C-alpha cells in the first residue's frame, strides 16, 4: 500500500499545480512524494514566505495553491501570513507536519489551537482516510474561501495507508443550494438606480472574483453611473472614461469629491472598510446605498438595501429591469474629464531641495517606462499608496497587496514569488520599503529565482515611515 504522504501528494496534485514551502523534518516525506507528481514545488527561505506566496498566487491567477512547512517552529513561523489569508478570504491549503499520534514532544505546540486562534480550520490526517481528508481540505478551502491546515502526524508520514476495504467512504462535498434572488428587492434597487441623478457603482475584489466587470459596465451605462473601485478591485472597469479610480486614500481629492456627490451608490463585492470609506467621509450621509454580496452577514452600517447573491446574477437582473432605461444622467455629461487615481497630484520636481526624490514623480516615470503587462506587488508600509495611485493597474489580479488585511509589512518579496509563478510572462513590479524589505531580505533570493522579468522598487525613507509620521509630532 502507498504511504500516507504519497496519497496526500497524489490527491493534492489533482487540484493544485504549485506548492511553496520550506522542507523540514515534518514534511520531508510529503515533499519527496510530491516529486513523483505533476505538481511543481517552489522553495522559499522562510515558512511565512510559503503561505504569503501561495496567497499571492491565488490573487494573481485565481487558482488554488498550497504551502508546506514542518511542525513546531516551522508552523509558528507561518502564523502571520496565515492570519492575513483568513482575513482576506484567500483559499489555500497548508500541509504541515504535526505532533505524532503517540503524543506531544517537548518541541511540539498545539498547532490546531494556534490555527484556530487566527481563524483557520485544521484537518488532521490519519492512515484510514488520507485521501478523503485531503479532498476535504481542498473542498473546504474552496467553498469557504479560507486557508485550511492539513496536519500530518510525524509518526504516520511514512506509514502505509489502511487497506481500501477498511477505509471509510471517500468524502464528497455537498453543493450548497443557491437561494433565488428576491424579486421585490431587485425591483426596489432598480427603481432607486433609475431615479438617481448621480448614481455611482463602487466595486471590489468580490466583483472581480465573480467576473462581474462586464455586466457592471453595462449597468453603469444603463443608468449613466460613474464607477469606482476599492484598492483590491483596481482595474475592474478598464479604461472606461467614467471610472473615478480607487475610492479612499489612494484616490485623488477630485475623484473623492465626485463620489461624495452621489445620491445612489451600488456597492458590489466590497467590504467598505475604513480606508475605502475615507474614515466615513467618502459618501454623502443622505445617499441611498445598495449592497450586493454573497454573504448575508456582510451588511455595512451605511447600507440601506442588501441584495444577497452572485454579482453577475444580481447585476444581470438589474440590467434586465432597466433595459428600457437608457437616459444618460446629466452627471456624466457634466463630470468632464474624470480624474483617475492620484494622477492629478503631479510631482513637479524630480529631485527636491533635500536631494531626495519625489515619489510622485518617480512612480509616474516608472509607469511610462514599465510594460503595461505587469503585476504590481505592493508590500505594506507608509509608502503603500504610491504604486496603486500612480501605476496603471490593468485588472484587479494585477495588484497584489498581501498584508493589507492584517496590516503587516515584510511580505513583499514572498508575495512576488507567488505572483511570478502565477504570471510568468508578465513583468513583476515589486514595491517594498527599507523596513519591510530588510525584514524579509532572505526571500529576495527566492524572488530572483522565481521571476523571469521583474523590477524591485525600494521606497527608502530611512526608517519606519508610518510611525515617524504618526508619532513624530506628539
Predicted ranges, named:
Residues 1-4, 151-152, 163-164, 168, ...:
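Phosphate/pyrophosphate-binding active-site segments
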Residues 2-83, 87:
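N-terminal cofactor/phosphate-binding cores enriched in small/glycine residues
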Residues 3-8, 13-17, 22-35, 337-425:
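Active-site diphosphate/adenylate-binding microenvironment
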Residues 14-18, 59-96, 116-168, 189-192, ...:
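Structural signature of the thiamine diphosphate
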Residues 39, 55-59, 71, 205-292, ...:
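Glycine-rich, anion-gripping cofactor-binding loops and their flanking helix/strand elements
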Residues 95, 103-104, 109, 299-300, ...:
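Thiamine diphosphate
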Amino acid at each position: 500500500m502507498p504511504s500516507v504522504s504519497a496519497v496526500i501528494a497524489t490527491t493534492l496534485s489533482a487540484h493544485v499545480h504549485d506548492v511553496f514551502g520550506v522542507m523540514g523534518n515534518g514534511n520531508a516525506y510529503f515533499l519527496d512524494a510530491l516529486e513523483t507528481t505533476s505538481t511543481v514545488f517552489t522553495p522559499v527561505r522562510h515558512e511565512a514566505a510559503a503561505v504569503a506566496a501561495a496567497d499571492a498566487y491565488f490573487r494573481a491567477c485565481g487558482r488554488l495553491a498550497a504551502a508546506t512547512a514542518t511542525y513546531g517552529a516551522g508552523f509558528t513561523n507561518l502564523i502571520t501570513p496565515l492570519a492575513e489569508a483568513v482575513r482576506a478570504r484567500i483559499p489555500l491549503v497548508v500541509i504541515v507536519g504535526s505532533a505524532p499520534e503517540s503524543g506531544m514532544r517537548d518541541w511540539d505546540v498545539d498547532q490546531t489551537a494556534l490555527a484556530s486562534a487566527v481563524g483557520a480550520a485544521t484537518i488532521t490526517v490519519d492512515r484510514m482516510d488520507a485521501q478523503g481528508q485531503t479532498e476535504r481540505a481542498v473542498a473546504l478551502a474552496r467553498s469557504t474561501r479560507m486557508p485550511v491546515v492539513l496536519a500530518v502526524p510525524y509518526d504516520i508520514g511514512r506509514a502505509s495507508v489502511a487497506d481500501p476495504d477498511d477505509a471509510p467512504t471517500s468524502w464528497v462535498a455537498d453543493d450548497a443550494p443557491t437561494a433565488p434572488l428576491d424579486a421585490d428587492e431587485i425591483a426596489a434597487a432598480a427603481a432607486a438606480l433609475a431615479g438617481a441623478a448621480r448614481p455611482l457603482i463602487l466595486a471590489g475584489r468580490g466583483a472581480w472574483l465573480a467576473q462581474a466587470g462586464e455586466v457592471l459596465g453595462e449597468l453603469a451605462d444603463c443608468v449613466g453611473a460613474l464607477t469606482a473601485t476599492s484598492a483590491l478591485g483596481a482595474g475592474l472597469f478598464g479604461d472606461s472614461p467614467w471610472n473615478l479610480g480607487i475610492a479612499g486614500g489612494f484616490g485623488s481629492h477630485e475623484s473623492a469629491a465626485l463620489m461624495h456627490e452621489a445620491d445612489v451608490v451600488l456597492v458590489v463585492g466590497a467590504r467598505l472598510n475604513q480606508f475605502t470609506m475615507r474614515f466615513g467621509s467618502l459618501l454623502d450621509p443622505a445617499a441611498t446605498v445598495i449592497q450586493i454580496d454573497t454573504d448575508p452577514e456582510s451588511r455595512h452600517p451605511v447600507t440601506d438595501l442588501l441584495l444577497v447573491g452572485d454579482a453577475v446574477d444580481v447585476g444581470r437582473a438589474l440590467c434586465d429591469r432597466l433595459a428600457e432605461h437608457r437616459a444618460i444622467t446629466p452627471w456624466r455629461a457634466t463630470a468632464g474629464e474624470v480624474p483617475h487615481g492620484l494622477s492629478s497630484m503631479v510631482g513637479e520636481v524630480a529631485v527636491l531641495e533635500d536631494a531626495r526624490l519625489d515619489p510622485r514623480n518617480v512612480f509616474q516615470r516608472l509607469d511610462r517606462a514599465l510594460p503595461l503587462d505587469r503585476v504590481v506587488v505592493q508590500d505594506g508600509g507608509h509608502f503603500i499608496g504610491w504604486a496603486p495611485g500612480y501605476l496603471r493597474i490593468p485588472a484587479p489580479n494585477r495588484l497584489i497587496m498581501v498584508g493589507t488585511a492584517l496590516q503587516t509589512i515584510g511580505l513583499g518579496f514572498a508575495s512576488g514569488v507567488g505572483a511570478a509563478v502565477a504570471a510568468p510572462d508578465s513583468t513583476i513590479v515589486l514595491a517594498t520599503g527599507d523596513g519591510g524589505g530588510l525584514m524579509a531580505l532572505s526571500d529576495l533570493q527566492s524572488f530572483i529565482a522565481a521571476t523571469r522579468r521583474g523590477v524591485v522598487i525600494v521606497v527608502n525613507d530611512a526608517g519606519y515611515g508610518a510611525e515617524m509620521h504618526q508619532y513624530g509630532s506628539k
